[in-house]
From Swiss-Prot:
Cofactor entry: Zn(2+)
SUPFAM superfamilies xrefs: Helical scaffold and wing domains of SecA (SSF81886), P-loop containing nucleoside triphosphate hydrolases (SSF52540), Pre-protein crosslinking domain of SecA (SSF81767)
EC number: 7.4.2.8
Protein name: Protein translocase subunit SecA
Reactions it catalyzes: ATP + H2O + cellular proteinSide 1 = ADP + phosphate + cellular proteinSide 2
Family matches, as NCBIfam families: PRK12904.1, secA
Any one GO biological process: protein transport by the Sec complex
Family membership: Belongs to the SecA family.
Length: 936
């Protein structure tokens, strides 16, 4: 109550910020008459002047009014577009490292030019981040005219681009590209073997377009560069036959044995997107697998040797029960292509992790691609937080303002619209069944069509858009379908969606990037006339004028009919996606309207709010075809959406907390890599490693401060001879000296190791040997890091079970991840020292050849893929991929062999068979099937 009272007096934080920025707007406007007097050359020369002032120490903040005024004047001359005052405010918000929420049609692309121009003056580069290649190319080509006029260079960073072109793009003052490509380039730069092979400069300033889509929707999906692992194709094919033979159980068994409506072999948790085998399901699966010869007769699926099989069983089950064709994926050209659930776009080249993608391929009977091993990965949260300054813009950020502030430290500022909005948002209508809902949608569309009003219908899946298309065909209503399958026609369809009587069906409109102008997009058609060489120059101007006159007539006609009408056929999990769909109508003060039509069969209502709404309908005795239209129901749905959003926020926050552990380690590894690449001579580093490793070896057999009776000299001599090519008569030294101590023995061994090393260097020369050492070091570091990533994945899969032992899973993960990391660094030192000490040199040329070969192997990995992998897809109930388990076991085993403190490697033979109903060996007191058996 007090807060509301104070806000009335002082205004909200948002209002105060906007008011503050309006003072700067007045200063920019005051400069306009003076800037208008400048010639083109004088205006261009301002950039050189600004650059000199920045290099002399003047701050960008002080330069802002002049730079914005110059940029606005250049835009007027080149693009024939003048920044509105609210756009200047948007530009300031971006410059100060905040998020600008601007409604659709308010000119976000033009707003970005202001802070981009200002920050590019520093010469440290600016990245403009978009959601897809089409928008990156469109915006770069469109705005390059403005930047080039002002003497700025512009680069476009696209996927599949040549390495040289990428370096040019990053060297430019301003670089446009997609979030994925910027992230992958960062990872690739940390896998190179030469400094000049890197493409990125220091991460200085980024403006992220559709910031909510990139920093929130995609934040659960780390960027992963992966290579091919072990082939299990045959096993996926065999397992694909299992799910159809199992029945779903309805209801969860409670402690008293009640709760099961229909017994079955597996249960589904649709909220968590998980599937679990029941007791009878395990028995049936074991029986079938034994019949197929995949496990021994009477053998348990929980036996250690069957963990891989368990992984495949769950992958097949999830593929059949939780992932549907034309909703979660499409089959195109013999491949399973993921559909982005937020935007409805096809995610070509992206694959689900943990064997799920292969299981879906087996289900759809297409060629099964091999499983992958992670080579490098990073989340968007950790990538974008590396920029010295980060900002973003979107039409819908206010609902996620807390998350932006909590995770990225970004404040959200809502920018006032240039003209007051006139869109009317009508109450939701809720029907009992999906068919009743679609009939109501068709009636609404027909009403709009009859009065010449354009309609945009939003659906949440490709399947629903195609079903609606069939119903419209039956009703005889002409329409356009815009979904992931028509990606190439996307912009053209959206541009014309504002014409009279136009009906457009679209999957989620997030990131579509093209404005819907009432009456159609005359500018695009005018551009086609300008570019058409077959039309004589003197005819072009009259044709374009005629086009604009026709457009004005259509524009007025559509405005009179009520503007663009938005129909939502389902509520999305996120209110923001619904708001994005609504935001397509009512741009720049145009009229418009929106309404959502829902049914109790929609996933959101069914899972989160269905019982409450159904009870209201039953109480009101609603006849078939009748809808509920009440504020209480709409609020109930919004409450369900808030619950889902809160849950998704927790998932993203938890992902970040876990990823922060590997991120700290990633920084250490990448920093070491960069130091190695830039160092001319790493002799000191190698020497320190050699001394450390040799000291550890000697101390194993001759401990510090010990007496002669405790020494194992024969074993030490053998270890030095076999592993390190050092033939030392230590026993003779002891016999000859009456008072030799452990430190003297250590010094003698270190001196011998140094001498052996120097003799190798003398054979080929310091420069050649140093190049070889660098190659060995990089190759070993990269291989160990890849194995370490797999080990962390494996550790993460089952860490939540520590909660059963009253331990904090996050703390346990941090502790064990650190132990694994320390063991990895020890194994790197050991491996590098071993190779350097054991290398047999015939000639300098041979050494150079070996170094080149190692670099070649490291930089040209087979079948490398660049993808997202959603951690929620892998699921805690599914076993870690075999490759992760094997790599983890191998690494822990290495650490033990070299004196590390990690646990002994897992061995199937050493573990006794545990029955499903036996107490879990971890000591939690639970049955094995309810504890560690769950992740098997």
């Amino acid at each position: 109550m007090t807060t509301g009272f104070l806000q009335k007096i002082f205004g909200s934080r948002n209002q105060r910020l906007v008011k503050q920025y309006q003072k700067t707007v007045a200063a920019i406007n005051a400069l306009e008459p003076q800037i208008e007097q400048l010639t083109d050359d004088q205006l261009r020369a301002k950039t050189t002047e600004f650059r000199q002032r920045v290099s002399s120490g003047e701050s960008l903040d002080k330069l802002l009014p002049e730079a914005f005024a110059v940029c606005r004047e250049a835009s007027k001359r080149v693009l024939k577009m003048r920044h509105f005052d609210v756009q200047l405010i948007g530009g300031m918000v971006l410059h100060y490292g905040k998020i600008a929420e601007m409604r659709t049609g308010e000119g976000k692309t033009l707003v970005a030019t202001l802070p981009v121009y200002l920050n590019a003056l520093s010469g440290r580069g600016v990245h403009v981040v978009t959601v897809n290649d089409y928008l990156a190319q469109r915006d770069a080509e469109w705005m390059a005219r403005l930047y080039n006029f002002l003497g700025m260079s512009v680069g476009i960073n696209l996927s599949q681009m040549d390495h040289g072109l990428k370096q040019e793009a990053y060297a430019a003052d301003i670089t446009y590209g997609t979030n994925n490509e910027f992230g992958f380039d960062y990872l690739r730069d940390n896998m190179v073997y030469e400094t000049d092979a890197r493409v990125q400069r220091t991460l200085n300033f980024a403006v992220v377009d559709e910031v909510d889509s990139i920093l929130i929707d995609e934040a659960r999906t780390p960027l992963i560069i992966s290579g091919q692992a072990e082939d299990h194709t045959e096993l996926y094919v065999r397992m694909n036959a299992l799910p159809p033979l199992l029945d779903r159980q309805i209801g969860e068994e409670k402690a008293d044995g009640t709760g099961v409506e229909k017994p079955g072999d597996y249960t589904l948790d649709e909220k968590a997107r998980q599937v679990f085998l029941t007791e009878s399901g395990h028995e049936k699966a074991e029986r079938l697998l034994a019949e197929w010869g995949l496990i021994g007769e009477g053998e348990s699926l929980y036996a250690p040797q069957n963990i891989t099989l368990m992984h495949h069983v769950y992958a097949a089950l999830r593929a059949h029960t939780l992932f549907y064709k034309d909703q979660h994926y499409v089959v195109q050209n013999g491949e399973v292509v993921i559909v982005d659930e937020f935007t409805g776009r096809l995610m070509a080249g992206r694959r689900w992790s943990d064997g799920l993608h292969q299981a879906v391929e087996a289900k759809e009977h297409v060629k099964i691609q091999s499983e992958n091993q992670t080579l490098a990965s990073i989340t968007f949260q950790n990538y974008f937080r590396m920029y010295a300054k980060l900002s973003g813009m979107t039409g819908t950020a206010d609902t996620e303002a807390y998350e932006f502030n909590e995770i990225y430290g970004l404040e959200t500022v809502v920018i006032p619209t240039n003209r007051p909005p006139k869109r009317i948002d009508k109450q939701d209508q809720i029907y009992k069944t999906a068919m009743e809902r679609y009939n109501a949608v068709i009636r609404d569309i027909r009403d709009c069509y009859d009065r010449g009003q354009p309609v945009l219908v939003g659906t949440t899946s490709i399947e629903n858009s195609e079903l609606l298309s069939q119903l419209l065909n039956k009703a005889g209503l002409p329409h356009e379908v815009l979904n992931a399958k028509q990606h190439a026609r996307e912009a053209a369809i959206v541009a014309e969606a504002g014409r009279p009587k136009r009906i457009t069906i679209a999957t989620n409109m997030a990131g579509r990037g093209t404005d819907i102008v009432l009456g159609g997009n005359a500018e695009k058609q005018a551009a086609f006339i300008e570019a058409d060489l077959s039309i004589p120059e003197e005819e072009k101007a009259p044709r374009i004028q005629k086009l604009h006159d026709e457009w004005q007539t259509l524009h007025d006609q559509v405005k009179a009919a009520g503007g663009l009408h938005i129909i939502g056929t389902e509520r999305h999990e996120s209110r923001r996606i619904d708001n994005q769909l609504r935001g397509r109508a009512g741009r720049q003060g145009d009229p418009g309207s929106s309404r959502f039509y829902l049914s109790l069969e929609d996933p959101l209502l069914r899972i989160f709010a269905g019982d409450r709404v159904r009870a209201i309908m039953d109480r009101l005795k609603m006849p078939e075809g009748e809808a509920i239209e009440a504020g209480i129901v709409t609020r109930s749905i919004e409450s369900a959406q808030r619950k889902v959003e809160a849950r998704n926020f927790d998932i993203r926050k938890q992902l970040l907390e876990y990823d922060d552990v590997s991120n700290d380690q990633r920084k250490v590894i990448y920093q070491q890599r960069n130091e190695l690449l830039e160092a001319h001579d790493i002799t000191e580093t190698i020497g320190a490693m050699r001394h450390g490793v040799i000291t550890d070896i000697v101390r194993q057999f001759v401990p510090a401060g010990s007496i002669e009776e405790q020494w194992d000299v024969p074993e030490l001599e053998e270890a030095l001879r076999n592993d390190w090519q050092l033939d030392l008569a230590i026993q003779e030294m002891i016999n000859e000296s009456q008072s030799i101590d452990p430190d003297e023995i250590l010094e003698a061994v270190l001196a011998a190791a140094d001498e052996a090393y120097e003799s190798k260097v003398e054979q080929v020369g310091r420069e050649s040997f140093s190049a070889f050492e660098r190659s060995v070091m990089l190759q070993t570091l990269d291989r160990s890091w890849r194995e370490h990533l797999a080990a962390l994945d494996h550790l993460r899969q089952g860490i939540h079970l520590r909660g059963y032992a009253q331990k904090n899973p996050k703390q346990e993960y941090k502790r064990e991840a650190f132990e694994l990391f320390a063991a990895m660094l020890d194994s790197v030192k050991l491996e590098v020292t071993r190779i350097v000490m054991n290398v047999q040199i015939q000639s300098p040329e041979q050494l150079e050849q070996a170094a080149e070969q190692m670099e070649e192997q490291g930089s040209h990995l087979e079948n490398v893929e660049f993808r997202h992998a959603d951690y929620s897809e892998g699921g805690a109930a599914v076993a870690a991929a075999p490759v992760a388990a094997n790599a983890a076991a191998a690494m822990i085993g290495d650490a033990m062999a070299h004196g590390g403190s990690a646990a002994a490697p897992f061995s199937g033979d050493a573990v006794p068979k545990v029955g499903r109903n036996d107490p879990c060996p971890c000591g939690s007191g639970k049955k094995y099937k309810q504890c560690h058996g769950k992740i098997a």
